[in-house]
């Protein structure tokens, strides 16, 4: 069961995202959700997932490298924005264009969503790969809760958005 504190933080993040859309004057925002990326440490994460060893010294190091991203899907482009996890604001106004990648739909060569097979009991989540000039990998988990990210992502899956 989620606590009120977590729900308030989530509501605050969702409001910050909506304010960000307004500041950036995005039009036609269809879907958005927050997800995780391992960046250059992805290979260690993959080895950890394949072996099922989550108690090694590598896992805590990878978790420190883990970054949260906001994926925004408009009719013309996909935007990838890094979200701060610590501090007063997750999307401060002074850094609207910082850590923002804009990918035109015509430049995207591939968009794949694959279920993550978990070796343990519980939901594994999904891996998202976007290939344009380079490949971007993300993961989304905890799809059983009613967070805005879980709701948006499940809606996109139901609509066949990634097919």
Predicted regions span which residues?
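Structural alpha-beta junctions
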Residues: 23-27, 103-106, 161-163
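A membrane-cytosol interface segment of integral membrane proteins
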Residues: 148-163
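Generic structural motif
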Residues: 37, 106-108, 116, 133-135, ...
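Intrinsically disordered, low-complexity segments enriched in small/polar residues
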Residues: 26, 37, 50, 85, ...
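Canonical phosphoinositide-binding patch of PH/PH-like domains
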Residues: 129-152
